[in-house]
Structure formats: structure tokens, C-alpha cells
From Swiss-Prot:
Family: Belongs to the ATG17 family.
Subcellular localization(s) per the UniProt record: Cytoplasm; Preautophagosomal structure membrane
Membrane topology type: Peripheral membrane protein
Biological process according to GO: autophagy of mitochondrion; cellular response to nitrogen starvation; pexophagy; piecemeal microautophagy of the nucleus; positive regulation of autophagosome assembly; positive regulation of autophagosome size; protein localization to phagophore assembly site
Function: Autophagy-specific protein that functions in response to autophagy-inducing signals as a scaffold to recruit other ATG proteins to organize pre-autophagosomal structure (PAS) formation. Modulates the timing and magnitude of the autophagy response, such as the size of the sequestering vesicles. Plays particularly a role in pexophagy and nucleophagy.
Alphabetical list of Pfam families matching this protein: ATG17_like (PF04108)
Originating species: Vanderwaltozyma polyspora (strain ATCC 22028 / DSM 70294 / BCRC 21397 / CBS 2163 / NBRC 10782 / NRRL Y-8283 / UCD 57-17)
UniProt keywords, alphabetically: Autophagy, Coiled coil, Cytoplasm, Membrane
UniProt-recorded name of the protein: Autophagy-related protein 17
Keyword Membrane: yes
């Protein structure tokens, strides 16, 4: 009967100890889970801050400084368009107009009508697009005005990104994060090291107490199965008696340890709640900076749109320059062709004169031969005409018409 009391008392104590330890461990686990979730959130914030830092540096140095200021505004727009392209426009505008003036100054000697509009070579060339480059040159000041405005917007944006967004807004969030969430913070040390270590120690104490109570219960159950005559009965009974006398003290220590766990958790959760509020504030500040980055991204799209307009202007100018260059080459070849035409006319005149001289010489030689032929015919008739009947060679014997006929025409050049 006495042994059964030991068993019942140890069972009751074990159940109570298990409930106390389980509840305490559950509260510790919940606190750890909340803190683990918080640590992941902090890691995410740390990651986002590093991303924003890198993105800010990329926007400032690569996109704004190098991409927009150096490559786009200074090289592509200012140098390439306002200087190089304007120089090309002026050169070819002067070139085409000078070429037309040259054609206007060359008299068309082939036109004998003094009142004709085609008295000079300029009459034969189109003047519809001669002023196209002049028009493009007149657009350059307007393009320069827009580029200057863009440069002003760029300077404003660069200062905003550098001085306000990076050096002020982002830096303030970084400093807030470092002050409140890095390991050298007192509260962070308590949450990551001091209090967790204490909770682990208390968990070990609870485990030891529960192990002692469980061991006492197991020994009580074993004693219940033994008989007084068994060899181990007396020694085990003495152990169970001694442990039973200490049972209340162990339970008291266990309860005190549970209370200490709760006090530690209270301190832990108090600090954690404060740090969680700071995390929410940090999130608020962080997402404010992210919104600023989005706004600046929209500003960058404006540069892209303006760049497209200026690129279209440049492409149009280059196309007009190429057309004007081709026109200049055509006009130069027209001038050369006209000079070659004059040479060709002289060559043809020379050929025509040679032909005329040859034909005149031919006529003279034929005339001489014909005179000789006429004499020979007369002599023939004197000697033979009276003896030959006419019908032996009808219409031919006494025919004194020339043996040749010569018809020709030479074009007047």
C-alpha cells in the first residue's frame, strides 16, 4: 500500500512536471520562431539595402555620369550633333550651293537663242531641295535649346540622386538599420546571445528536473513489481523513499525555473516587441526610398524619349546629307559631261568635215573619169556607129549619160 502511494505521487508529479515543461518549452519555441521570422525579415531588409546601395551607385555613376552626361549629352548630342553634324551640314550646304553657282556661271553655248532660259547649265538642274540643309541648320539652335534644357534637368536629377536620395534618404535608412539591428546593439546582443543562452540553460534545468522525476516514477513502478524477498527490493525501496522525500523540493525548483523562463521570455518579448516596431519603421523608411528610386526610373525614361527624338533628327540630317552629297556628285558629273559634250561636238564636226572633203575629192575624180569616158564613147561612135544596128544594144550604144550617180548628205553639226 505504501509503495502504491509512491507510484501515485510520482505519477501525479510527473504529469504536472510534463505539463509545466511542455508549456514552457512551447512558449520558448514560439518566441524562437517569432525571432527567427524577424531575423529573416532583417536579412531581407539588409539584402534590399545592399541592392539599393548598388543600384544607387549604378544609377549615379554608370547611368547618369557615364551613360547620360558623358556619352549622351556631351559626346552624342553636344559633340556629335551640335559640333560634328552642324559642321557637316554647313559643309555640304555650302558645297551644293557653290556647285549650283558654278553651273549657273557656265554658259550653254549650244543654245543660240539669246532669250532662252537655258542659256546656262543651272537651268537643267532641280532646285527643289537645295535649301533642305539650310532648313536643318536653322533647326540646330532649337535642338541646342532642348539639349541645354536636358542638361539642366540632368544636373537637377544628378544632385537629387547623389545628395538627396543616396547621401540623405538611403544613408539615413542605413544608419537607422545599423544603429538598431546590427550585432553591436545592446538589444540585439540580448536577443541573439544573452537571453537565448539563458533560455537554453533553463531548458537544460527543466530537462534535468523532468528526467529526475521520470526516473523516480520508473523506479517506483519497478519497485511495485518486486517482492520483499527479491535481492534488490530493500535497496530500491530506500532509493524511492529518499527520492520521494525530495520530490516536493524538485517540483518547487521546477516551478521556480518555469517562472524564471517566463520572466526571461517577458524580458525577451519586451525587447523583441520594441525592436519589431523599429523594424516596421525601417520598412516604412525603406519602401519610401524604393518609391524614390521608381520615380527616378520614370525620369530616366524621359531621357530615353528625348534621346529618341534627337536620334531621329540626326538620322534625318544624315539622310539629307547623303542625298545632297549624291546630288553634288551628280552635278559635278553633269558639269564634266557638258565639257565632254563640247569636245564630242568638235570631234563630230571634224569627222563631218573629213567626210565632206573625201566626197568632194571623190566627185572631182569621178568627173575626170567621166570626161575621159565621154571622149572614148564619141571616138567609138565615129569609128563604129555607122556599121552597128541600133537594136543590137538598144538605147545603149549612143547613150552618153554618166556611168555613175552620187547622192549623199552630211548632217550639219
Amino acid at each position: 500500500m505504501k509503495i502504491e502511494r509512491f507510484v501515485n505521487a510520482s505519477r501525479k508529479t510527473l504529469v504536472e512536471a510534463q505539463v509545466l515543461c511542455q508549456d514552457a518549452n512551447s512558449r520558448i519555441s514560439n518566441a524562437r520562431s517569432s525571432f527567427s521570422h524577424w531575423e529573416r525579415s532583417i536579412s531581407k531588409i539588409r539584402f534590399l539595402l545592399n541592392c539599393l546601395k548598388n543600384q544607387g551607385s549604378f544609377i549615379k555613376n554608370c547611368i547618369l555620369k557615364v551613360g547620360i552626361e558623358e556619352n549622351l549629352i556631351e559626346k552624342e548630342w553636344t559633340q556629335s550633333i551640335l559640333v560634328d553634324l552642324a559642321k557637316e551640314l554647313k559643309y555640304w550646304n555650302s558645297k551644293i550651293n557653290e556647285q549650283v553657282r558654278v553651273l549657273d556661271s557656265i554658259e550653254n553655248i549650244l543654245d543660240e537663242d539669246t532669250k532662252s532660259e537655258s542659256k546656262n547649265l543651272g537651268y537643267f538642274v532641280s532646285r527643289d531641295n537645295l535649301d533642305i540643309l539650310e532648313k536643318r541648320l536653322k533647326e540646330i539652335p532649337n535642338v541646342k535649346y532642348h539639349i541645354d534644357n536636358i542638361r539642366g534637368q540632368y544636373n537637377t536629377m544628378f544632385k537629387k540622386v547623389s545628395n538627396y536620395l543616396i547621401n540623405k534618404r538611403l544613408k539615413s535608412v542605413q544608419e537607422y538599420f545599423l544603429t538598431n539591428f546590427e550585432n553591436d546593439s545592446d538589444d540585439i546582443k540580448k536577443l541573439t546571445t544573452t537571453l537565448p543562452s539563458k533560455l537554453v540553460s533553463l531548458e537544460h534545468d527543466l530537462a534535468d528536473y523532468l528526467s529526475s522525476i521520470t526516473n523516480h516514477y520508473d523506479q517506483s513502478k519497478l519497485l511495485q513489481t518486486l517482492k520483499p524477498a527479491d535481492p534488490d527490493y530493500t535497496d530500491l525501496l530506500e532509493v524511492v523513499k529518499n527520492d520521494n522525500s525530495e520530490l516536493d523540493g524538485i517540483v518547487t525548483l521546477l516551478r521556480e525555473t518555469v517562472d524564471e523562463v517566463d520572466e526571461t521570455l517577458k524580458t525577451f518579448l519586451g525587447i523583441f516587441n520594441e525592436i519589431e516596431l523599429k523594424q516596421k519603421e525601417c520598412n516604412k523608411l525603406l519602401f519610401g526610398v524604393i518609391e524614390e528610386f521608381k520615380i527616378n526610373h520614370e525620369y530616366l525614361l524621359i531621357f530615353n524619349d528625348i534621346s529618341s527624338l534627337i536620334d531621329n533628327f540626326k538620322e534625318t540630317c544624315i539622310e539629307d546629307i547623303n542625298n545632297t552629297r549624291s546630288l553634288c556628285i551628280f552635278y559635278q558629273k553633269f558639269e564634266i559631261g557638258y565639257q565632254n559634250l563640247l569636245f564630242e561636238i568638235e570631234r563630230r564636226k571634224t569627222v563631218a568635215q573629213k567626210m565632206t572633203d573625201i566626197i568632194k575629192n571623190c566627185e572631182l575624180e569621178l568627173s575626170k573619169i567621166n570626161e575621159e569616158d565621154q571622149k572614148n564613147r564619141s571616138e567609138f561612135l565615129k569609128l563604129n556607129g555607122d556599121y552597128l544596128p541600133e537594136n543590137i544594144w538598144p538605147g545603149k550604144i549612143d547613150d552618153f549619160s554618166p556611168l555613175y550617180s552620187l547622192e549623199y548628205s552630211i548632217k550639219e553639226i
